[in-house]
Amino acid sequence: MDILIVTPRADFWNGLNGVFEKRGASVRTACAMPEALASLKEKKAALAVLDLFGGEAWNGAEHADAMKKAVISILMQDAMTNTASVCGMGEETFHDAMEGLGMINDLPAQPSEADVEDLMSRLRVILGQA
């Protein structure tokens, strides 16, 4: 299973690669959406993790608009790519802001190994691998 992480902080995510690999996933990164879309065109991903704001605190409408555009761009490239955000906006805000986009969940701005484990468990359920 291939995971694409869109992030300006690849070093941070490199520290979590072991969690993905333990679940049988390979990880690649893209520093911005144009690179991510080009990467998806070359090779599909089971999941795109959108860490667009580099660990910044949730900024409301501005971040919501950017996240929606990113998710829609990915779905237009490949509608089978699952997505998750990294904003730490909280469950209620996440559901209100991202309603209808079919995203798995929102991770905290500084995800832990446990957060990644939870995300991978959810993805496996969606993919019928649980």
Segments and roles (model prediction):
Residues 62, 82-108:
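Alpha4 helix (beta4-alpha4-beta5 surface) of REC/receiver domains from two-component response regulators
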Residues 41-43, 73-81, 101:
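Conserved phosphotransfer cores of two-component systems
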Residues 93, 111-127:
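C-terminal output helix
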